[in-house]
């Protein structure tokens, strides 16, 4: 049908015999638009309880200099938002200097100089792997993940971001964010991890709750030979620490069911952490029925600065949305050491949940490296082993060939994604390629299948 027909023919008449569409018929767990360098993963469509990650680089029109930027959804809101476009839209100085630049996004800025042309931009990320497959119409999975790569042009830095959603219950779940960054030719000065969250209060402490003794600082500024966007940050406080840290961002809700985003981050040598305020989140100010006056509230901002490279000392974070009436399920997050016979960027995470489940995660920058942490051995970009007293188990092999625990071993001759779950006395699996599962003295040769099916 030609577009001109809407104006030259008779008025358009809607056939009321055609039933209204259901949005669930058009949504998949993973959505990828390479023409816009935009990747979305979700674990459901419940407005209050589902989680969603939106990642984007810069491909096409109306794009920003943001590297691998991400937004997180939780408890009905875009809790971790991009900044927007400023008070005077695309023509304003605040857009040119801040809103279109790295520090206004949830990303990593290298040496304080990362930037490139905005509006019409041609700086896409490369999708290395994801599960479920983009556009695949399957049930929402208990674990999803993605891995993307980006070459930051100004600093000539390689950046890799691995993100995951882990569903732990009908109303609970958490995000995993592993961001690796290093300059191609070395000479790294620092890598700055920016994270912005909705809310009015922010509490940054060591992971055990002890004070970091944050002190006022002017370190994040244009005077540090950084892009001018840094000077838009204010009320800055910092501490140099190698400790694991925890940050709570809180929205004070009118009904007093306050919403929080809880963030745990792995510590590292030569690291500083900052609490700060950024200009208001203009992008949220146009959304009706927000819980507070967005234009009147500066944006809560966390920055982690890694001196030197941040590839073998990556930024590793776990995020969990919660509220007063729906508290989080995580009691603690630790980051155990990972053993490997090959040098590389190997990450271990242990998430202890209040109801007894323990999730163990290993991630590597090379899926061919054999990595071991505790009783878990993997060859994979990302692997998870969740166990609740043996009667509620989950095993996920992401972009790898081996996941081995004391009672279960998953292996494949080719790099694959495998989901194996045990619940209510039934084993189910899904796999993107042929694989083997060994457990209880038996060996199962499994064929590929996208939906969870009985073993």
Where are these regions (language model features)?
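Polysaccharide-binding surfaces and accessory modules of carbohydrate-active proteins
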Residues: 194-271
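Solvent-exposed beta-strand/loop surfaces of large extracellular or lumenal domains
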Residues: 94, 205-218, 281-295, 447-455
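Acidic, glycine-rich loop-and-strand cores that form catalytic or ligand-binding grooves
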Residues: 1-25, 29, 257-285
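Short amphipathic beta-strand/extended segments with alternating polar/hydrophobic composition
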Residues: 50-57, 79-84, 120-121, 160-163, ...
């Amino acid at each position: 049908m030609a577009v001109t027909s809407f104006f030259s023919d008779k008025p358009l008449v809607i056939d009321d015999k055609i039933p209204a569409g259901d949005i669930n018929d058009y949504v998949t767990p993973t959505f990828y638009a390479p023409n816009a360098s935009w990747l979305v993963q979700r674990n459901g469509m419940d407005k209050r309880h589902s989680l969603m990650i939106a990642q984007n680089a810069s491909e096409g029109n109306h794009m920003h200099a943001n590297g691998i930027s991400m937004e997180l959804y939780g408890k009905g809101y875009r809790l971790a938002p991009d900044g927007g476009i400023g008070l005077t839209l695309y023509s304003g100085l605040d857009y040119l200097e801040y809103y279109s630049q790295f520090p206004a996004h949830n990303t990593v800025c290298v040496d304080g100089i990362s930037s490139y042309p905005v509006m019409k931009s041609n700086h896409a990320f490369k999708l290395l792997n994801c599960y479920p497959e983009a556009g695949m119409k399957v049930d929402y999975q208990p674990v999803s993940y993605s891995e993307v790569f980006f070459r930051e042009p100004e600093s000539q830095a390689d950046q890799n971001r691995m993100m995951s959603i882990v569903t732990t219950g009908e109303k609970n779940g958490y995000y995993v964010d592993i961001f690796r960054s290093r300059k191609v030719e070395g000479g790294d000065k620092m890598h700055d991890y920016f994270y912005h969250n909705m809310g009015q209060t922010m509490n940054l402490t060591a992971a055990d709750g002890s004070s970091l003794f944050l002190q006022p600082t002017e370190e994040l500024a244009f005077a540090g030979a950084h892009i001018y966007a840094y000077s838009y940050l204010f009320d800055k406080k910092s501490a140099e620490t190698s400790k694991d840290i925890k940050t709570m961002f809180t929205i004070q809700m009118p009904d007093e069911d306050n919403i929080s985003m809880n963030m745990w981050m792995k510590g590292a040598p030569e690291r500083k952490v900052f609490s700060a305020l950024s200009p208001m989140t203009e992008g949220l100010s146009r959304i009706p029925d927000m819980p507070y006056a967005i234009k009147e509230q500066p944006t809560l901002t966390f920055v982690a600065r890694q001196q030197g490279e941040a590839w073998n000392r990556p930024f590793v974070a776990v995020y969990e949305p919660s509220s007063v009436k729906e508290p989080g399920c995580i009691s603690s997050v630790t980051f155990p050491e990972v053993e490997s016979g090959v040098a590389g960027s190997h990450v271990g995470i242990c998430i202890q949940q209040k109801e007894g489940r323990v999730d163990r995660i290993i991630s590597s920058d090379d899926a061919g490296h054999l990595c071991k942490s505790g009783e878990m051995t993997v060859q994979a970009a990302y692997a998870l082993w969740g166990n609740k007293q043996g009667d509620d188990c989950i095993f996920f092999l992401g972009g790898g060939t081996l996941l081995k625990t004391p009672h279960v071993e998953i292996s494949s001759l080719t790099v694959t994604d495998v989901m194996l779950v045990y619940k209510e006395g039934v084993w189910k699996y899904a796999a993107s390629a042929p694989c083997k599962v060994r457990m209880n003295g038996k060996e199962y040769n499994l064929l590929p299948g996208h939906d969870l099916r009985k073993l």
